[in-house]
Amino acid sequence: MTIPLYEVLILASILFAMGLACVVAWRANVIMMLIGIEIMLNAVMLTFVGGSAHWGIAEGQVFSLMIMALTSAEVSLALAMVAYLHRRKQSVDTDDFSSMKG
């Protein structure tokens, strides 16, 4: 039993829209922006895997693994910066990141 590609694309579009809404609605909070970005990247991975399964090629799954590696590095760096900012300013607002100029 296979899932049609259009259903995968509809689900990925809904997920991407939810992630985009999270990023736009919570622009002041860095953690909520990270969650939204992760949801959007998961939608992209779902699209790659769905296309890969539909056309019978493995490149979509390889790209999904690369996206997973990229997002894990992105999250670890972003959370380290958020932890540093929270210790220093007692806040996780995006406006406070301008004080971290090196």
Curated annotation (Swiss-Prot):
GO terms for cellular component: NADH dehydrogenase complex; plasma membrane. NDH-1 shuttles electrons from NADH, via FMN and iron-sulfur (Fe-S) centers, to quinones in the respiratory chain. The immediate electron acceptor for the enzyme in this species is believed to be ubiquinone. Couples the redox reaction to proton translocation (for every two electrons transferred, four hydrogen ions are translocated across the cytoplasmic membrane), and thus conserves the redox energy in a proton gradient. This is NADH-quinone oxidoreductase subunit K 1. It is a multi-pass membrane protein. One of its GO terms (biological process) is ATP synthesis coupled electron transport. Belongs to the complex I subunit 4L family. It comes from Citrifermentans bemidjiense (strain ATCC BAA-1014 / DSM 16622 / JCM 12645 / Bem) (Geobacter bemidjiensis). The keyword ATP-binding does not apply.
